Amino acid sequence: MIRYLTSGESHGPALTAIVDGLPAGIDITQNDIDSQLLRRQQGYGRGGRMTIESDKAEVMSGIRFGKSIGSPITLLIRNRDWENWTTTMARFEEPVEEIAKISIPRPGHADLAGRIKYGFNDIRPVIERSSARETAARVAAGSLSRVFLKALGIEIGSYVSAIGSAAEPTVNPAVEELLVNGAECLALEADRSSVRMLNKSAEAGAIAAIDEVKKQGDTLGGIIEIFITGVPMGLGSYVQHDRRLDAMLVSALMSIQAIKGAEIGHAFENSRKPGSQVHDEFFLSENTGLERKTNRAGGLEGSMSSGQTIHLRAAMKPISSLVTPLHSFDLETMKPTLSRFERSDTCAVPAAGVVAEAVVAPVIANALLEKLGGDHFIEIKSRLETYRDHLHRTFKA
């Protein structure tokens, strides 16, 4: 089982991730990790932090001569901004008097509940760990599972379908055309846009909307669509709640900072229709075996992969740190005041898509390992080929 933990504060010396359970024998390059970190830093509407950081992962363990060796992989990403925070984020020194305590929580953020939960007299520790800066470590960690999956013919990609009210067409033929060549083809096309949109009109509308809210000191959220191609039928299980693949994928998406909703396939649209207009019918073909003409279920049925492309959707709220303040109060004086501003992005929806790709990768990798077993890439690949051949023969009978 692949599992990972991240550590580090937004303005501490570094972020770290320890990835345990990755099989041995997987070819991994430095670029496999750093290219994903670079993608995360892109996107129209990002804040000043992205001009400071240039994220690179230092591999401290678990890889030898370009291959995973089965032991925990430790990744370290240094924070260049740390040099400006050595006093505020000092680890052992006594706090100096000029460091002001933060006592005014921002609505929509972890500030208030985090301060109360952990008994702090300063909101700063909450801000540091709840920050989406942490996702850099998760993108690095997820890149390892992503490499593993791609070597087995499974690809992950995403694009942004809406930022604010600027939205892609509900039916976009370009998506299906790109997915024919794998989900990474879709992601590469999306990456050509500064807002990771496929439709030029929607892209222009999103950029204009970001510019407008930035002038107003406001922020924007949006919707990201995630696709996973090449997943064989039968991953996950209906037998127990904690083995349901749909639940694990949605949980992974909901773990991303500022994600407030997740959907599989056309779930909410399907809820308004009769079953005869929702369920994806089976058709048998002498040439290809089992066929389906629709994928409204998003590649998941009965909590298991159906063999179709997995389609997920996630909704990101507008970022909680606003230049134009909202009503708040001071925890020290218990008097009303306006909320404070912490350096942030105007819109981080494009980056959230990259993070979403990263967090679903270990989920799919674990479902595959649960089905196939194995400790070395070669034996896992052999078992997957055998299983795929079995599926092919089953539906060609």
Swiss-Prot record:
Q: Which pathway does the record list? A: Metabolic intermediate biosynthesis; chorismate biosynthesis; chorismate from D-erythrose 4-phosphate and phosphoenolpyruvate: step 7/7
Cite the record's note on assembly: Homotetramer.
What Gene Ontology terms for biological process does this UniProt record contain? amino acid biosynthetic process; aromatic amino acid family biosynthetic process; chorismate biosynthetic process
Q: Which InterPro entries match?
A: Chorismate_synth (IPR000453), Chorismate_synth_AroC_sf (IPR035904), Chorismate_synthase_CS (IPR020541)
Q: Report the co-factor binding details.
A: Reduced FMN (FMNH(2)).
Q: Which residues bind NADP(+)?
A: 40, 46
State what this protein does.
This reaction introduces a second double bond into the aromatic ring system.
Reaction(s) catalysed by this chain's protein: 5-O-(1-carboxyvinyl)-3-phosphoshikimate = chorismate + phosphate
Q: What is its EC number?
A: 4.2.3.5
The text of the family note is: Belongs to the chorismate synthase family.
Name one molecular function that GO assigns to this entry: FMN binding
What the entry lists under CDD domains is as follows: Chorismate_synthase
Question: Which protein are we looking at?
Answer: Chorismate synthase
Annotated keywords = Amino-acid biosynthesis, Aromatic amino acid biosynthesis, FAD, Flavoprotein, FMN, Lyase, NADP
Any single Gene Ontology cellular-component annotation: cytosol
The question of whether Disulfide bond is a record keyword is answered with: no
Tell me which cofactor or cofactors this protein depends on.
FMNH2
Gene designation per UniProt: aroC
Which annotated residues bind FMN? 129-131, 257-258, 302, 317-321, 343
* Keyword Plastid found: no
